[in-house]
Swiss-Prot record:
Parts of the chain on the Lumenal side: 759-761
Every GB1/RHD3-type G domain range: 28-260
Compartment annotation: Endoplasmic reticulum membrane
PANTHER family per UniProt: PROTEIN SEY1 (PTHR45923:SF2)
Protein name: Protein SEY1 homolog
Organism per entry: Cryptosporidium hominis
GO CC term (a single one): endoplasmic reticulum membrane
Length: 815
């Protein structure tokens, strides 16, 4: 026996200590709860001990007299002659002198608590008080009837017959031989009818729905019990009859509040707390509250037990140790065992609460399964994204097509193209097909508990992809998992690869195009310009324009089909916005401009060559002999050849129509050339800044400063050539040849080394001084060092002057 609620209304958490005496499983509804109410010192505890073989403390008149024995609420367990455990609440007696005027508060709380937790309430009433109001506790009974409405027990279906009604067992004590149960029953019912009419009137004014009679909400049993001291045998006989009726008809098979034995302590605690805190005591809500708590607790216990199994599954998936069948078998086993363990506990609680918690359990488990599948699909995604041979595949398709095209030259051609969308979708289809093979079979308990629809609502599409019914051999539900996160990553990777493939193909296309352009335009400057000194600039630009047009037509014909094939399914708008013809025209002119600009670095050589061809050769191409030539004629010839050769620098300042022979076909071609050539745009901007430039009406390909530098270099060499011609004309002979010993010295030491030393007289002198110092140091004759040093300086100066003059003279002659 344990005191659960003490004298000061504090709930002591010792219900579990009482339940330890029960040998049956704690997860059961197969028990009943009985409470007893009545006035103090009327034998309540004695009756309980006789009925249930309990050991509640009873009144000892000899030692303590008539006083309060039971304080608060005590709980005991009785199993004697009962098929299932009986939990008995021995409630402190009412109308006690010890509590005084505050007794009503505790009495009402105790009565309401007893009504909330009991299958059967025993009302212990002495026969002599049956016709009184206060002593018979009928005032308290009226409170109980009123409290029934606040408990909202009708929401559990009591008035509809779905759940057994609470039994009010009236134990009328100390009856005589003239009193019988029938007479006592009529009296009790008469009193109850009177009380019910009063309660119904007050509840009707509050708007509550009133049952027709108290019998709609309570079962009433009345037993007359003889006095134990006066009629021991009669007392025992009636007690045995009550016990028999309790076992066979009064007590239900299961606890009417649908709370398993293990959840009873929490239920009683929350009920008492609501009563003490003066909160609304809604019994269905309290039942749901306890059910929710215990079901969530059971769910957490299940998850704690299966976390290791789930983690092992995830590790095996990450290590590729599980195939499709192993994954399906393992997940089915986890679901079967976890749900079986869960419903073993939760099935005893409120169905709605147990279902909700089971859905929460399944959502967590499916989410962990999804993580395992995503981990595995991450590895598969990394395998699928290795596309190093895609570009080779594309090229091979082009080559195969070319072979087929050669065989069917007269038939309509079918060109292979790289379709980005088709390729990406094809690879994603492989991923989806693989993802759908990771399936989980639902155990039969999911169907029995009608959980398919809630699972679909909670898990699709975030966790599960779909739930399908398979009819192969047996009807089972199969779930596949949402792998959109990995699919999205793969799609992004594919898009990047696709773009890289196009970029590579475009790069190779333009590399091939530029290579052919350079190959075709390179001879233009040599053939038309360098080899023919008589060619005029207008003729040069006419021939060059004609060649560029022909090259353009040739390249368009060559690359047209490749262009169409490459960009047919491309989203690269920066390339497809302009047509092939305009693109080739743009690249042709740009590369030709670059070629001319590159020639500018050595263009003074071209000017000198043209000068030589005109100045040193006659009309028949025979070298001129300047000996005896008239000086005036030589000068006129020199001026003419020089002016003619320097005029070719105008090639760097052509007109727009000369530079762009295709401008008539492409109106905005010049603007694109300026846009794509930073050097050209900078030169144009620079020349516009010089208002006195002589080529403002032309397209400048080089700056004026570079042009002046070219003319200066060419003029120097032209002047040197003319000077040598004058020397020959005046002396009648060629410049002196190089001495033999100079050649020998060049062979032994090297021309570059000798030139470097000779162009540095100070270095030669320092070397000679160093040699004389070393000699003097070794011999100890430092006076000779000073003499030798002076002589070396004088001799080296003379020798260097002579050798330098000879070499420069010979080199000038070779030029």
């Amino acid at each position: 026996m344990r005191q659960i609620i003490d004298y000061d209304c504090n709930f002591k958490e010792e219900v579990g200590e009482v339940l330890k005496d029960i040998s049956t499983s704690q997860n059961t509804l197969g028990f009943n709860v009985i409470s007893i109410l009545g006035c103090q010192s009327t034998g309540k505890s004695t009756l309980l001990n006789a009925l249930f073989d309990t050991h509640f403390k009873v009144l000892d008149k000899l030692t303590s007299g008539y006083c309060q024995t039971t304080k608060g609420l005590w709980l005991g367990c009785g199993t004697e002659s009962f098929n299932s455990p009986i939990l008995i609440w021995d409630v402190e007696g009412t109308d006690s002198l010890e509590r005084g005027e505050d007794r009503a508060t505790f009495e009402n709380r105790a009565a309401l608590f007893s009504l909330a937790v009991s299958d059967c309430m025993i009302l212990n009433i002495p026969l002599m008080n049956l016709t009184t109001y206060s002593s018979s506790n009928f005032g308290l009974l009226k409170t109980i009837l009123n409290s029934w409405f606040s408990l909202k027990l009708d929401q559990n279906g009591i008035t509809r017959g779905n759940i057994r009604k609470t039994t009010l067992l009236f134990a009328v004590r100390d009856i005589t031989i003239n009193d019988n149960d029938e007479m006592l029953g009529r009296k009790v019912v008469q009193i109850l009818d009177l009380l019910w009419r009063q309660v119904a009137e007050s509840q009707n004014s509050l708007g509550n729905q009133i049952p027709a009679s108290f019998s709609d909400i309570f079962e009433v049993k009345v037993y007359g019990i003889p006095s134990l001291p006066n009629d021991y045998d009669g007392f025992k006989q009636v007690v045995a009859a009550i016990r028999y009726d309790l076992t066979t008809s009064i007590l239900p098979k299961d606890y009417t509040r649908r709370i398993p034995l293990e959840g009873l302590e929490m239920y009683c605690k929350t009920v008492w707390k609501c009563i003490v805190d003066c909160q609304e005591l809604n019994i269905p809500s309290q039942i749901k509250l306890v059910s929710r708590f215990r079901c969530e607790q059971a769910k957490d216990d299940i998850l704690d037990g299966y976390k290791k199994s789930i983690k092992d599954l995830q590790k095996k998936m990450e290590k590729r140790e599980f195939g499709f069948n192993e994954f399906s078998d393992c997940t089915l086993l986890v679901l079967e065992n976890s749900l079986a363990a869960y419903f073993e506990v939760a099935s005893k609680y409120d169905h709605e609460m147990s279902t909700n918690s089971s859905i929460s359990l399944l959502v967590f488990i499916f989410h962990e399964f999804q993580n395992a599948v995503n981990s595995r699909m991450s590895l598969e995604r990394q395998d699928l994204r290795q596309y190093t041979n895609i570009l080779d595949y594309y090229k091979k398709g082009i080559e195969d097509h070319q072979v087929q095209y050669d065989k069917e030259n007269n038939e309509e051609s079918h060109y292979v193209s790289f379709d980005s969308s088709s390729w990406v979708n094809k690879e994603l289809l492989k991923f989806d097909s693989l993802s759908l093979k990771w399936k989980t079979e639902f155990p039969s308990v999911i169907s029995r508990q009608h959980l398919i629809s809630p699972i679909k609502e909670k898990c699709i599409p975030d966790i599960l992809n779909e739930i399908s019914l398979s009819s192969q051999g047996k009807e089972v539900f199969l779930a596949t998992y949402n792998t959109q996160e990995q699919r999205k990553l793969l799609s992004e990777t594919l898009e990047i690869h696709s773009k890289k493939i196009y970029e590579k193909l475009v790069e190779e296309f333009f590399e091939s195009l530029i290579k052919d352009i350079l190959k075709e335009i390179s001879p233009l400057l040599g053939d038309h310009f360098l080899s023919d000194p008589k060619l005029k600039l207008d003729d040069f630009w006419e021939l060059t324009g004609s060649s560029i047009v022909n090259i353009h037509r040739l390249l368009v014909s060559k690359y047209e089909q490749q262009w169409i094939t490459l960009f047919k399914n491309s989203n690269m708008n920066e390339f497809t916005s302009s047509g092939l013809e305009e693109e080739i025209a743009l690249q042709l002119v740009l590369k030709f401009i670059q070629l001319i600009q590159q020639q500018s670095k050595y263009f003074h050589i071209n000017i000198v060559d043209r000068f030589k061809n005109e100045f040193e050769l006659d009309q028949d191409g025979v070298p001129r002999q300047w000996i005896g030539e008239d000086a005036k004629t030589m000068k006129e010839l020199f001026i003419k050849a020089k002016n003619n050769s320097l005029q070719i620098t105008n090639v760097f300042y052509p007109r727009k129509d000369q530079l762009i022979p295709l401008s008539g076909r492409f109106s905005n071609l010049f603007d694109k050339i300026i846009e794509n050539s930073e050097d050209l745009s900078g030169i144009i901007a620079l020349n516009k800044g010089h208002g006195n430039g002589k080529f403002l009406d032309s397209v400048p390909l080089i700056s004026e400063s570079n042009l002046k530098e070219i003319e200066s270099k060419a003029s120097q060499e032209i002047t040197s050539i003319f000077s040598k011609a004058q020397l020959i004309q005046s002396t009648g002979r060629q410049p002196q040849n190089i001495p033999w010993w100079i050649y020998l010295l060049i062979i032994i030491l090297g021309f570059d080394e000798i030139t470097y030393v000779l162009t540095s007289p100070v270095l030669v002198t320092l070397l000679l001084l160093l040699a004389s110092f070393i000699y003097s140091y070794l011999t100890g004759n430092f006076s000779s060092f000073c003499n030798y040093s002076q002589q070396f300086v004088i001799i080296s100066t003379k020798i260097l002057h002579y050798i330098s003059g000879a070499i420069h003279s010979s080199l000038d002659n070779r030029k």
